[in-house]
Amino acid sequence: MTATVRRARTADAAALKTLDTVVPEDPRRAASIDAWLAHDIVFVAEVEDKVVGYAVFNHAFFRQGNIDMLMLHPDHRGKRIGELLLRPLESLCDTPKLFCTTNVSNHRMQRLLSRLEFVACGFIDELDPGDPELVYVKKLRAEG
C-alpha cells in the first residue's frame, strides 16, 4: 500500500471531516476544514484512492509559514505518511522559517518534526489546559 500526495480539492471536504478525530467532539473543526480548503493550502494523502490524511499550510502564525494541521487516520499513523504530507509544505513555504506546534502529549508528532529537522523553540500554555503546545521551527534559508 503506497501513499500518494496531492493538493486537496473542495470535494475532499467530506472525506477530511470523516477521518478527522476532532470533528465528532467539536463541530467547529468541520467549519475549520471548510475554511482551510477555501483559503489555505491543503494536501491530502491517499492509499488505494481513499483519503487517509491531510496537512494545512498558511501564514496564521505571526505571518510566518505555518503547518496549521496534520491529521492522519489512526490506522495509517507510523507509516511515514505524515512526512510525505509535510515535504511539499516545506517546498511551498515562502518565508525563511516554517513553524509548527504540537501538544506535549503528542510524542509521535514530536518525533516526526525532529526527523524533519524542526527544532523546539518555545511553548504556549493554556490552549489545552494541562497539555502545553510546543512550538517548533525549521530554518529553510537565511533571512535577509
Outline where the language-model segments fall.
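Conserved GNAT acetyl-CoA-binding A-motif
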Residues: 93-104
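Conserved active-site alpha-helix within GNAT-family acetyltransferase domains
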Residues: 83, 105-122
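Solvent-exposed beta-strand sheet faces enriched in polar/charged residues
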Residues: 58, 101, 121-124
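Glycine-rich phosphate-binding loop
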Residues: 80
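C-terminal "cap" of GNAT-fold acetyltransferases
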Residues: 103, 126-144
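Acetyl-CoA-dependent GNAT
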Residues: 3, 7-13, 17-69, 73-75, ...
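Short secondary-structure boundary/hinge segments and terminal tails
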Residues: 67, 94, 108, 130-132
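Residue-level recognition of the GNAT/N-acetyltransferase active site
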Residues: 73, 77, 101-103
